[in-house]
Amino acid sequence: MPQSSPSAAATASDMDKNSGSSSSSASSGSSKGQQPPRSASAGPAGESKPKSDGKNSSGSKRYNRKREPSYPKNENFINQSRRSNSQKSKTFNKMPPQRGGGSSKLFSSSFNGGRRDEVAEAQRAEFSPAQFSGPKKINLNHLLNFTFEPRGQAGHFEGSGHGSWGKRNKWGHKPFNKELFLQANCQFVVSEDQDYTVHFADPDTLVNWDFVEQVRICSHEVPSCPICLYPPTAAKITRCGHIFCWACILHYLSLSEKTWSKCPICYSSVHKKDLKSVVATESRQYVVGDTITMQLMKREKGVLVALPKSKWMNVDHPIHLGDEQHSQYSKLLLASKEQVLRRVVQEEKAALERQLAEEKHTPESCFIEAAIQELKAREEALSGLAESRGEVPGVVAALEQRVLMAPLAKESVFQPRKGVLEYLSAFDEDATEVCSLGPPHPVALPLVEEEETVSEPEPEGLSEACEDLELVEDNLGEGTICTESSQQEPVSKPSVTHLSSSPCYYFYQAEDGQHMFLHPVNVRCLVREYGSLEQSPEKISATVVEISGYSMSEDMRQRHRYLSHLPLTCEFSICELALQPPLVSKETLEIFSDDIEKRKRQRQKKAREERRRERRIEMEENKKQGKYPEVHIPLENLQQFPAFNSYTCSSDSALGSTSTEGRGALSLSPLSRSPGSQADFLLTPLSPTASQGSPSFCVGSLEEDSPFPSFAQMLRVGKAKADVWPKTAPKKDENTLGPPAPVDSDGESDNSDRVPVPSFQNSFSQAIEAAFMKLDTPVTSDPLSEEKGGKKRKKQKQKLLFSTSVVHTK
């Protein structure tokens, strides 16, 4: 390699300050011929710029390593080990390359396959991120299993949780509107001096917040104030739907210098003038197994108010606050100024006065007095004493509302002139196509009447088509059916084929007014039994089998046309009941038994999946805390893990059979037995009567007192009980004279070939104990055996191969 001139070296050093990594490496190589070029394994060439600077500034090249970034120690060790031996010269900076930067990561992933970064990331993710500082802006989305999804695609989390349905949900892409949700799930008491025609024609039209006098909420539990954590006193609700005590929210708003403040819960803007009176009523929360009572509801097509059939009236005008029978079925309740003063203002005034008397000497009393002053101003405005001050905002709001709702108001004005034709054509397209196959009907009748009367000329074709439609709806787990779909069963009930031609929907709803409706399987059973829902009982009571919750959307409204009066985002549930023969006959239940059993299997499968999912989540959470599941080793194999009870029972059965065949009786004196049979006999378990009469028997006492004895206990117990065994043997003979074959615990006799399953108390230690006791019995029973025959006893002694007893000194 030729040597370069000093001028060339100076030129190269000047170029190093402005050039990239390639020129710096070339200049360093040309100025120092002893040093080979940097290897590619040490890192990218684009990071060698600080090394050339260190070469030119010889005074600071020793302190350049202090500027190295704070990386994990293991990663620095890996980087240092990969350096080549040629880099150990003094002219090179020992600072490791920055592997966390963008250029180095691209280089390593492109030239080295990304394996080194993967190893480093795996080692860093294996430990807690608090142990390493690491480079900034690390993407940890892979740890959360989180990926961004394009806005145009539908997720699987919308609606009721069904993925296939969520893709078809068109409304689910709209952003969540708190005010829309509040107005869809609450009831409003509004002033009667406004026009609400649009709201009674379109369920999704929002009510002007300035017209609201009181909000009524039906919940399963009484709400509490988030500030004082007590049931709210003179409760006020914000536009975002959160409830506070009046004094608490005034105290919170006074802490801000602005005229508004953020909501303590959702951080929405809260203005003092937007606070409305609220009343929360607690309703029963039904669960599976409860008995629920549902009543038959009736709703005209095109009308947004559904009333019980027993309390039916023609809803020509909105329902007022004083109508107690129908007030719970309407979203809007019109109230006069006198009713607002009596039902709203006076109640809040009494509550504030009680609170002031209790907290008169507390710092909160000033805010209670401020609430009372605002309540007096409202009372004056309602009573007409301050019309010039109080009515101007209301008039302005009314004008704005009318300007915004002018197009919808025009449609609502022309809608009654067209009857119900235009409203129903959007929801009943399928039914009209089926009806168009029949003979023509008079033009004077509206389209709805054609749907009601078409079942008379063609009951068969329509019933088959509607049954298929109902089956599809049932398989999807959606909704129930209405009048026109419930009149397809006149074949089985010819006496009720002539039905009313009124364009109405009939459905079952909870008696207390909750949005709980009957499942289509139960509806078909009632239609089969009574001919139609119109002829069904007004009230039914049954046990809840399943409750499915939904939220109203455009797709749900298309499927359940009878629920089109519910606004969007309104929460409702569909209940499946267990109908019994007093309500429906056994023949009807047999007809729909397949559908009922199918749904039962689906519920069981869903419950199993939920349990598995809960166990899996619990195991994952325990693993995060260092708790791992225990290892379960099965010990059910009797060949590898023999049980002592099974062996003794089999030997006892063999002994009983041979003794019965030879001598004709099971009980004999121990003197007439052979030594081997006597030892086997003493180890057999006692009968139930014998075990109760003699609890001091050796085997029984061992199983009860010490299920897992030690080796020393085996020897000690065996020696202590050895002298007692011959005395207890006659008791067994006396007790076993009655039954010829004792019955085992599982209900089978000992003479059967089947070996009973050993109990959980048996263990391997008991089998070892029995073996040692069997070896000790011939030695302890020498006096008895010598009376029978001394020669035979001597031969028995010679068979003893091993003994652990230290007492055998005779």
Curated annotation (Swiss-Prot):
Keywords, ordered alphabetically: Cytoplasm, Metal-binding, Nucleus, Phosphoprotein, Transferase, Ubl conjugation pathway, Zinc, Zinc-finger
Compartment annotation: Cytoplasm; Nucleus
Protein task: E3 ubiquitin-protein ligase that catalyzes monoubiquitination of 40S ribosomal proteins RPS2/us5 and RPS3/us3 in response to ribosome stalling. Part of a ribosome quality control that takes place when ribosomes have stalled during translation initiation (iRQC): RNF10 acts by mediating monoubiquitination of RPS2/us5 and RPS3/us3, promoting their degradation by the proteasome. Also promotes ubiquitination of 40S ribosomal proteins in response to ribosome stalling during translation elongation. The action of RNF10 in iRQC is counteracted by USP10.
Protein name: E3 ubiquitin-protein ligase RNF10
Similarity remark: Belongs to the RNF10 family.
Region named Interaction with MEOX2: 101-185
Residue pairs linked by disulfide bridges in the UniProt entry: none
Span of zinc fingers (RING-type): 225-267
Superkingdom of the source species: Eukaryota
Biological process terms in GO annotation: positive regulation of myelination; positive regulation of transcription by RNA polymerase II; protein monoubiquitination; ribosome-associated ubiquitin-dependent protein catabolic process
Molecular functions (GO terms): transcription cis-regulatory region binding; ubiquitin protein ligase activity; zinc ion binding
Ranges of compositional bias, category Basic and acidic residues: 607-623, 722-735
Assembly with partners or alone: Interacts with MEOX2.
